[in-house]
Amino acid sequence: MKRSIIAAAVFSSFFMSAGVFAADVDTGTLTIKGNIAESPCKFEAGGDSVSINMPTVPTSVFEGKAKYSTYDDAVGVTSSMLKISCPKEVAGVKLSLITNDKITGNDKAIASSNDTVGYYLYLGDNSDVLDVSAPFNIESYKTAEGQYAIPFKAKYLKLTDNSVQSGDVLSSLVMRVAQD
């Protein structure tokens, strides 16, 4: 019996000392786990670049208009649709504007080569101005499983409290497709 008590005391002191040293280590472990899924949605070749050709308007159409007013009688629409395909049925497909053509202080305005006139952008026939500062949902433009065709339209936008300047009003936007 005496030997078993001594053996128990030796074993318990051994395990207790191991616990004391376990807290005083100078290294740790970081484990990173990931998963690679199917390719994300992509712009289709030939449908990855579209244009809106705006009608020419005189500077006088902006006289008396406040800053961030649109000229509603000149609406430009895309010549064709921006086309996106997904490898399988996915939910939450969105587009994001990833260029610096946004106007600070107005999440919906798009800058141009003309400091006094820019654009508001719209999706399809929607009359709500597109918030270009955040990803926008394109689910309602689905044409088939995993296929999307997105029409855009634009209106001229006055960007100044003063008179607008004549000249080109160019803007080039880069968009990224993503999914939730």
UniProtKB/Swiss-Prot annotation:
Name the record gives this protein: Uncharacterized fimbrial-like protein YehD
Description of the deletion phenotype: Deletion of the operon under classical laboratory conditions does not result in any major effect on E.coli capacity to form biofilms compared with the wild-type strain.
Pfam families reported in the protein's UniProt record: Fimbrial (PF00419)
Source organism (scientific name): Escherichia coli (strain K12)
GO CC annotations on file: pilus
Gene Ontology biological-process annotations: cell adhesion; cell adhesion involved in single-species biofilm formation
Residues of the signal peptide: 1-22
Triggers of expression: Expression is negatively regulated by H-NS and subjected to cAMP receptor protein (CRP)-mediated catabolite repression.
Family: Belongs to the fimbrial protein family.
Top-level taxonomy: Bacteria, Pseudomonadati, Pseudomonadota, Gammaproteobacteria, Enterobacterales
Gene encoding the protein: yehD
Transmembrane segments annotated in the record for this chain: none
InterPro entries referenced in this protein's UniProt entry, alphabetically: Adhesion_dom_fimbrial, Adhesion_dom_fimbrial_sf, Adhesion_dom_sf, Bact_Fimbrial_Adh_Pro
Keywords: Signal
Miscellaneous field: The operon is cryptic under classical laboratory conditions, but is functional when constitutively expressed.
Function: Part of the yehABCD fimbrial operon. Could contribute to adhesion to various surfaces in specific environmental niches.
